[in-house]
């Protein structure tokens, strides 16, 4: 089993954190230590487990690594990886402080009642077995503001930067071993306006844009990704692309997971989702031909 442990390089280094992928039986793990571990950007770790497949995997991994390895390795990146390793191994007390700060934020948010704590609903999903306590996902629409607008105003008015925003939520991340000012964050959060709560008197209707974005269902696959990507293609207006086969991978960010793959039929709900995401503050679509997703590349007939 290969695991992309992008946001879990700190897992397993504190009793309050989930177990790391290696401890759970993974054979090969890529940990993006630059995200939450503390190493410099562009640095990461590749771990090979001492499991039944290790002897077979090691020469294959070594061969693949040498294929892309730089002949001018960065001493700065390597040193930062070693410092990160040491900080995680010896930082139990510091991580305790980080977890306590995150729990304080969630506790106050619950007590005040304006915003929702997304993680409080995780128990309803059997496939969620653990959650990172250092990631604080908050339902901003419950508090009358979109996630994108909340993120923008938190930074503009309070110099508070959250990790990511969606139409309905923000995610604040506490670095493992860091000591955030929880009171400052909570004050800034609860000073946000609530424009979505403004309604026409007597209308009972929601404000424009009140309905949250929902992930589109994937369209049916008509070709393999290889056939669609390498085959002849043409560019059409997004509206015309509905019902045609995509030649590109299109991924709305956040979170950056593909919504349309080469070879899949482009649906109207996918076009709407991609364009609304692109129009939102901080949103963009990877793989799109232009920022507004006005044109799409499709497989030529």
Q: PLM features: residue spans?
A:
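Solvent-exposed alpha-helices and their adjacent loops that cap or buttress functional pockets
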Residues: 20-24, 36-40, 128-130, 163-166, ...
């Amino acid at each position: 089993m290969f695991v992309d442990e992008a946001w879990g390089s700190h897992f397993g280094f504190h009793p309050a954190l989930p177990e790391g992928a290696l401890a759970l039986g993974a054979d090969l793990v890529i940990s993006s230590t630059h995200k939450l571990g503390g190493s410099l950007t562009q640095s990461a770790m590749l771990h090979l487990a001492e499991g039944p497949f290790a002897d077979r995997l090691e020469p294959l991994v070594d061969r693949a690594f040498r294929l892309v390895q730089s002949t001018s390795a960065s001493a700065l990146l390597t040193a930062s990886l070693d410092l990160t390793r040491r900080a995680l191994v010896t930082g139990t007390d510091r991580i305790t402080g980080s977890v306590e700060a995150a729990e304080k934020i969630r506790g106050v948010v619950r007590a005040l009642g304006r915003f929702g704590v997304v993680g409080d609903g995780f128990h309803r999903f059997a496939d969620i077995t653990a959650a990172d306590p250092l990631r604080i996902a908050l339902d901003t629409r419950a508090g009358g503001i979109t996630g994108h607008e909340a993120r923008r105003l938190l930074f503009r008015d309070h110099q508070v930067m959250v990790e990511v925003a969606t139409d309905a939520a923000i995610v604040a991340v506490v670095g493992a071993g860091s000591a955030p000012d929880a009171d400052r964050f909570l004050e800034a959060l609860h000073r946000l306006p609530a424009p979505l709560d403004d309604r026409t008197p007597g209308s009972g209707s929601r404000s424009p844009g009140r309905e949250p974005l929902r992930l589109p269902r994937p369209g049916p696959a008509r070709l393999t990704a290889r056939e669609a990507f390498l085959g002849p293609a043409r560019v059409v207006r997004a509206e015309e692309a509905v019902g045609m086969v995509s030649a590109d991978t299109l991924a709305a960010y956040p979170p950056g997971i593909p919504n349309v793959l080469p070879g899949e039929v482009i649906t109207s709900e996918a076009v709407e989702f991609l364009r609304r995401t692109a129009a939102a503050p901080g949103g963009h679509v990877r793989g799109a031909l232009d920022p507004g997703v006005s044109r799409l590349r499709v497989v030529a007939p």
